[in-house]
C-alpha cells in the first residue's frame, strides 16, 4: 500500500473511473460489506460476514470478489472522535494490507467515524431497533463508508 492515504486516493481517482467497488466495515467479530458502482456513486448494503476466524472471513471475501469482480476495495478506518488511532485502527490497516496482498486489488482507507451510530439511526428510522439491528448494522455501516467515499471530492472523476 502507498505511504499515505492521500497518495492512494489520488492514484485511485485518476485510474479507477468505472466498475464495482466493495467496502468493508471491519470488526473483530463481524465485517459489514457494501457494494456500489463507481460511475453511479450509489452504495448498497450487501452482507455481514459473521465470523471471528481469519480463514473463513477471507474465504467469504474471496467468493465476493470472484462474484462481483471489484476494481477497488474501500476499508473503513476506525479512529477516535478526535482522529487519534487506537488498537482497532491498526487492525483495520492490517486488514486492508491483507486484502490488497491477497487479491491484488487497490485498497483505499476511508474514515469511518460515526458510521455505526448513523447505521443505528438509519435502522431505527425504519422501525428496526435493539437486537434486531445486529444482522444488518455492520453492512449498513459499510454502506455509509462507501457512500462517504463516493460523495467525497477524492472520488470525483
UniProtKB/Swiss-Prot annotation:
Its main location: cytoplasm. It is found in: Cytoplasm. Keywords: Cytoplasm, Hydrolase, Nuclease, Ribosome biogenesis. CDD domains: YqgF (cd16964). One of its GO terms (cellular component) is cytosol. InterPro entries: RNaseH-like_sf (IPR012337), YqgF (IPR005227), YqgF/RNaseH-like_dom (IPR006641), YqgF/RNaseH-like_dom_sf (IPR037027). It is an enzyme of class 3 (hydrolase). It comes from the Bacteria. GO terms for molecular function: nuclease activity. Belongs to the YqgF nuclease family. NCBIfam families: RNAse_H_YqgF. This is Putative pre-16S rRNA nuclease. The lineage of its organism: Bacteria, Pseudomonadati, Pseudomonadota, Betaproteobacteria, Nitrosomonadales.
Amino acid at each position: 500500500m502507498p505511504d499515505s492515504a492521500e497518495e492512494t486516493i489520488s492514484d485511485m481517482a485518476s485510474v479507477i473511473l468505472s466498475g464495482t467497488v466493495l467496502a468493508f466495515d471491519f470488526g473483530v467479530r463481524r465485517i459489514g460489506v457494501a457494494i456500489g458502482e463507481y460511475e453511479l456513486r450509489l452504495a448498497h448494503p450487501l452482507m455481514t460476514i459473521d465470523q471471528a476466524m481469519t480463514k473463513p472471513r477471507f474465504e467469504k471475501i474471496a467468493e465476493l470478489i470472484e462474484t462481483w469482480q471489484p476494481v477497488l476495495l474501500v476499508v473503513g478506518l476506525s479512529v477516535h472522535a478526535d482522529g487519534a488511532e487506537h488498537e482497532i485502527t491498526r487492525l483495520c490497516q492490517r486488514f486492508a494490507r491483507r486484502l490488497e496482498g491477497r487479491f491484488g486489488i487497490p485498497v483505499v482507507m476511508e474514515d469511518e467515524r460515526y458510521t455505526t451510530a448513523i447505521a443505528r439511526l438509519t435502522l431505527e428510522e425504519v422501525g428496526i431497533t435493539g437486537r434486531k439491528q445486529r444482522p444488518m448494522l455492520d453492512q449498513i455501516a459499510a454502506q455509509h463508508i462507501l457512500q462517504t467515499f463516493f460523495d467525497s471530492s477524492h472520488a470525483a472523476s
